[in-house]
A protein has these predicted regions:
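Acidic, serine/threonine- and proline-rich low-complexity regulatory tracts
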Residues: 201, 205-214, 224, 229, ...
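GST-like fold's C-terminal all-alpha helical module
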Residues: 103, 110-211
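Short, flexible loop/turn segments with low-complexity composition
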Residues: 102, 217-226
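Active-site-flanking alpha-helical
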Residues: 90, 167-168, 219
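Eukaryotic N-terminal low-complexity, Ser/Thr- and Lys/Arg-rich leader segments
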Residues: 1-7, 217, 230-237
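Residues embedded in well-ordered beta-strands within globular domains across many folds
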Residues: 58-61, 163, 219
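GST-like domain detector, emphasizing the conserved glutathione-binding G-site
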Residues: 1-144, 148-149
C-alpha cells in the first residue's frame, strides 16, 4: 500500500507521544498537515469529531474528501495511540521503519514495550512524583544493555527508535535543566552520571537519534524546553 489520501496530524510539541508520530511521518516522507491542539483550552470538537475514543493526542485522520481539521469528513479514517499510528505508517510505506527479519522485528517491538512500560513508569516517577533517580538510571542502563555495539536499537532505524527518541530527548533535556518534582540538583546529578563512561553507548545512541533528519525536523529544543519549564504538572511545590 502507499499513501493514497490526505493525512491530518493532531499534535502538540510538548508531547513525547505526538513526537513519535511526527518522527515517523518525516521518516516515511508522508504528505501531511500538522494541526497543533491548544492543550490549555482543549477543543471540544477534537473530543467529538477526531478522537472520541481516548480524547488524547496524537491522532490522525486519513483519506476522505478535503475538510477543515476541526470538522473532518466522516469518511476519513481516524486513528489514535502513537504506536498504532506509527505501525499504520509502516504499512502505508512498506520497506521503511520495520526490519524485514521477524526476529529483529520482534526485538524492535520488545524495545517499544519496554519504553511504554518500564521507562515510562520511571519517567513519570522521577519527573512527576519526585521518586529517587536510581530507578530511572536503572531503566536507562537496561535499555543500553539491549543496544547493539553500533547503530540503532535493532541496527537500521526502526519503530523501536521512533518510540524511544522522544522520551530519551526529553529525559536528557529535563535532567540537564533540573526540571521536575525531585529535590533541586538531583536532575543535574543524574545528568552528570549519564556522562560517565558507563553510559557511553546510550549517549552515542541518543546523539545518533538527534542527528537524524526526521528528529531534527520534528524537534525544536528551545520550544520544548520552554513548554516543560512551564508545565504545571512537574513544578516543585
Ligand atoms: N498511549 C497514548 C498516550 C497519549 C497521551 O497520553 N497523550 C497525552 C499527551 S502526551 C494527552 O493527550 N493528554 C491529554 C489528556 O489526558 O487529557 C499514545 O501512545 O498515544
Amino acid at each position: 500500500m502507499v499513501q493514497s489520501g490526505q493525512i491530518t496530524f493532531y499534535t502538540h510539541m510538548y508531547s513525547p507521544y505526538c513526537h513519535r508520530v511526527h518522527i515517523a511521518l518525516e521518516e516515511v516522507q508522508a504528505d501531511y498537515k500538522a494541526v497543533t491542539i491548544n492543550v490549555m483550552e482543549w477543543p471540544q470538537w477534537y473530543n467529538t469529531k477526531v478522537n472520541p475514543i481516548t480524547r488524547k493526542i496524537p491522532a490522525i485522520t486519513y483519506g476522505g474528501p478535503a475538510a477543515p481539521p476541526e470538522d473532518p469528513s466522516p469518511e476519513a479514517v481516524k486513528l489514535t495511540e502513537s504506536m498504532v499510528i506509527v505501525e499504520f505508517l509502516a504499512d502505508l510505506f512498506p520497506g521503511k521503519l520495520r526490519p524485514s527479519d521477524p526476529v529483529q522485528l520482534a526485538y524492535a517491538r520488545l524495545f517499544v514495550a519496554l519504553f511504554d512500560t518500564k521507562v515510562h513508569e520511571a519517567f513519570k516517577g522521577f519527573f512527576f512524583m519526585g521518586t529517587p533517580a536510581s530507578d530511572l538510571l536503572d531503566q536507562l542502563e537496561g535499555i543500553q544493555a539491549r543496544l547493539p555495539e553500533t547503530g540503532f536499537a535493532v541496527g537500521e532505524f526502526s519503530i523501536a527508535d521512533v518510540a524511544a527518541a522522544p522520551f530519551l530527548a526529553r529525559i536528557m533535556l529535563l535532567l540537564e535543566n533540573d526540571i521536575g518534582k525531585y529535590p533541586v540538583g538531583e536532575g543535574k546529578k543524574a545528568f552528570e552520571e549519564l556522562q560517565k563512561p558507563k553510559f557511553a553507548r546510550l549517549m552515542k545512541y541518543i546523539a545518533d537519534i538527534k542527528a537524524r533528519s526526521s528528529f531534527r525536523a520534528s524537534y525544536d529544543h528551545a520550544q520544548v524546553l520552554f513548554i516543560w519549564q512551564n508545565n504545571p504538572a512537574i513544578q516543585r511545590a
